[in-house]
UniProtKB/Swiss-Prot annotation:
Numbered residues of crosslink Glycyl lysine isopeptide (Lys-Gly) (interchain with G-Cter in SUMO1): 52, 102, 228, 280
Subunit organization: Associates with mature 80S ribosomes. Interacts with EEF2/eEF2; interaction sequesters EEF2/eEF2 at the A-site of the ribosome, thereby blocking the interaction sites of the mRNA-tRNA complex, promoting ribosome stabilization and hibernation. Interacts with SPIN1. Interacts with CHD3 and TDRD3. Interacts with ZDHHC17 (via ANK repeats).
Annotated positions of the Phosphoserine modification: 25, 197, 199, 203, 205, 208, 221, 234, 329, 391, 393
Any GO molecular function: translation elongation factor binding
Keywords: Acetylation, Isopeptide bond, Methylation, Phosphoprotein, RNA-binding, Translation regulation, Ubl conjugation
Highest taxon of source: Eukaryota
Biased composition (Polar residues): 242-256
Role this protein plays: Ribosome-binding protein that promotes ribosome hibernation, a process during which ribosomes are stabilized in an inactive state and preserved from proteasomal degradation. Acts via its association with EEF2/eEF2 factor, sequestering EEF2/eEF2 at the A-site of the ribosome and promoting ribosome stabilization and storage in an inactive state. May also play a role in the regulation of mRNA stability: binds to the 3'-most 134 nt of the SERPINE1/PAI1 mRNA, a region which confers cyclic nucleotide regulation of message decay. Seems to play a role in PML-nuclear bodies formation.
Biased composition (Basic and acidic residues): 70-80, 89-114, 122-162, 183-199, 261-274, 281-291, 327-341
Modification Phosphothreonine, positions: 226
Organism: Oryctolagus cuniculus (Rabbit)
Cross-referenced InterPro entries: HABP4/SERBP1-like, HABP4_PAIRBP1-bd, IHABP4_N
Protein name (Swiss-Prot/TrEMBL): SERPINE1 mRNA-binding protein 1
Family statement drawn from the similarity comment of this UniProt entry: Belongs to the SERBP1-HABP4 family.
Length: 407
């Protein structure tokens, strides 16, 4: 009916790829099932009906375990796969039926737990088991070592553990860091807390009797001075030095006063101590400004200038000399000669006949600017026309007759 809207409509659509997405099973399980079928076919030909039933049971357990493991595998395990040296079960071992050993009469040995996991298709580590660490054997205790702290070198090199990469620290073949030295002692007898230097003075200080020094005696790199430097800075040491210096001065004065044949009287130590205390009790010496200036003037070196006296070192042959003055007549004659020389005129000179008036001359050159025309039309007038227009005099601005329109 015209004008009536159709309420519903449809069209037939056939999608050839619609059935591909219907399967919700895991593709790994499908592949595993295909492999199990091949195993069953191979096992039936070799071992008979008993072997076939055992193969079916093993295949069923394998498929179930693989399905569970694949379902439980998290996204984190997929992002961080195992290293390549960790292998998966070889295909030869998978395809080989487990019952084939019975036919040949060989007794089957029970599997270890890792081999059982291997049969179930689980990823395992194919590396051999780690050996237990060797026992550390020491030839002698520390007390029995020789004098001077020297360690014995009689032990062969083979017994020593491998140091560095691949050592006993983290198993064979791995990136080990050698044997740990956290206990402060290894098989070769080195001590962790010893200081090592170029001369080995500090490392064997406990055995050789050398004293350990915190400072290097003022030599070498990283020099911190000597131990005596701190003693010299102490106040007790300074007091002792002052007392020694005072005693030396007293003895030197006594030796100068006494003749050579006489013996020197021995000074008592108590008197020396009293003198040192008196020197300390005096304190700083005070003086006035005038006294201080007098002392400074005495110590100051006087500067002497070698000033030449008048007529010192004069030559006697010039004593009769006198000053010569020019006469006035010679000067007047010289002036006349100079004037004649500069103002002499030639016979054909006509400069005196010329009359030059600077005020009457008009402005030559540019002249009138007429003849330009309108804006944009025509240019400047020719150079030749300027000479004609320059002859016409300019009108007088003050003359009212020159401008009749303004009157």
């Amino acid at each position: 009916m015209p004008g009536h809207l159709q309420e519903g409509f449809g069209c037939v659509v056939t999608n050839r790829f619609d059935q591909l997405f219907d399967d919700e099973s895991d593709p790994f399980e499908v592949l595993k099932a295909a492999e199990n079928k091949k195993k069953e076919a191979g096992g039936g030909g070799v071992g008979g009906p008993g072997a076939k039933s055992a193969a079916q049971a093993a295949a069923q357990t394998n498929s179930n375990a693989a399905g569970k493991q694949l379902r439980k595998e998290s996204q984190k395990d997929r992002k961080n796969p195992l290293p390549p040296n960790v292998g998966v079960v070889d295909k030869k071992e998978e395809t080989q039926p487990p019952v084939a050993l019975k036919k040949e009469g060989i007794r089957r040995v029970g599997r270890r737990p890792d081999q059982q996991l291997q049969g179930e298709g689980k990823i395992i580590d194919r590396r051999p088991e780690r050996r237990p660490p060797r026992e550390r054997r020491f030839e002698k205790p520390l007390e029995e070592k020789g004098e001077g702290g020297e360690f014995s070198v009689d032990r062969p090199i083979i017994d020593r553990p491998i140091r560095g990469r691949g050592g006993l620290g983290r198993g064979r073949g791995g990136r080990g860091r050698g044997m740990g030295r956290g206990d402060g002692f290894d098989s070769r007898g080195k001590r962790e807390f010893d200081r090592h230097s170029g001369s080995d003075r500090s490392s064997f200080s406990h055995y050789s009797g050398l004293k350990h020094e915190d400072k290097r005696g003022g030599s070498g790199s990283h020099n911190w001075g000597t131990v005596k430097d701190e003693l010299t800075e102490s106040p007790k040491y300074i007091q002792k030095q002052i007392s020694y210096n005072c005693s030396d001065l007293d003895q030197s004065n006594v030796t100068e006063e006494t003749p050579e044949g006489e013996e020197h009287p021995v000074a008592d130590t108590e008197n020396k101590e009293n003198e040192v205390e008196e020197v300390k009790e005096e304190g700083p010496k005070e003086m006035t400004l005038d006294e201080w200036k007098a002392i400074q003037n005495k110590d100051r070196a006087k500067v002497e200038f070698n000033i030449r006296k008048p007529n010192e070192g004069a030559d006697g042959q010039w004593k009769k000399g006198f000053v010569l003055h020019k006469s006035k007549s010679e000067e007047a004659h010289a002036e006349d000669s100079v004037m004649d020389h500069h103002f002499r005129k030639p016979a054909n000179d006509i400069t005196s006949q010329l009359e030059i008036n600077f005020g009457d001359l008009g402005r030559p050159g540019r002249g009138g600017r007429g003849g330009r025309g309108g804006r944009g039309r025509g240019g400047r007038p020719n150079r030749g026309s300027r000479t004609d227009k320059s002859s016409a005099s300019a009108p007088d601005v003050d003359d009212p007759e020159a401008f009749p329109a303004l009157a």
